[in-house]
Amino acid sequence: MQNQSEKNTFSWSEFYAHRKEIRKLYPSVYKLALKKKLFDIVAAELRGKEKILDVGASTRRLGERINKKLSGVTYKTMDIDRAKKHDYYSLDEIKETFDVIVLSEVIEHISFQEGIDLLKRLATLLVSGGRLIVSTPNLHHPNRYWDSDHKTPYRYEEIAAALVSAGFNVRNIYRTYNDRYLRRFVRVYFMAWLHRYLDVDFAKSVVVVAEKP
């Protein structure tokens, strides 16, 4: 684990500068490419026989889809919930490295500083050139964030800036939204103008793909 001096190296001025740069690349949430599911993004990042770690894996649903749709991928999980079977129950137990790590709907449950520390810790579990895929509730959605156990809200430019502050290079930022065909069609192709006017978004999550240098 990181010592206190390492934790204190975070710079708010650098974070704000990173956030500004992300805003230049993606001036609004509507500039983010829309994907149906997190799995679509993860699958696009897996290159053959790679190892993936799912942090906060819960029911291992992502692994079920990977095993069904992809071949040669080694899928492992880490979750603090011992009621479910996982490969690891603490990051400190992990003594191997991975090509891809997924952190899905986890970071909003801890404080901002804990989030930065977590991102830095995950970087140590990635190979050079490894990808970290982070999803978090989309703050432009009217009610997506407001669960009682959520602690830290992140706008898309903030979660991306946090990753840069933790030493990653941001490669892509996406929104995810999936629904019944007709409802999705109407929202994506007919109601988008109204969402933009009201500054709200129907996409439930923001997903950032970042790379370890």
What are these regions (language model features)?
Residues 1-102, 113-120, 125, 156-157, ...:
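Conserved N-terminal segment of class I S-adenosyl-L-methionine
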Residues 84-86, 141-146:
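A short acidic, helix-capping loop that chelates divalent metal ions and anchors anionic groups
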Residues 106-109, 138:
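Hydrophobic adenine-recognition pocket in adenosine-nucleotide-binding enzymes
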Residues 129-136:
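Conserved beta-strand signature within the Rossmann-like core of class I S-adenosyl-L-methionine
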Residues 137-141, 153, 176-180:
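Short "lid" loop at the C-terminus of a central beta-strand within the Rossmann-like core
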Residues 143-162:
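Acceptor-substrate binding/catalytic loop of class I
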Residues 164-165, 170-183:
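C-terminal alpha-helical "lid/dimerization" subdomain adjacent to the S-adenosyl-L-methionine
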Residues 207-213:
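C-terminal lobe and adjacent flexible extensions of AdoMet/dcAdoMet transferase-like proteins
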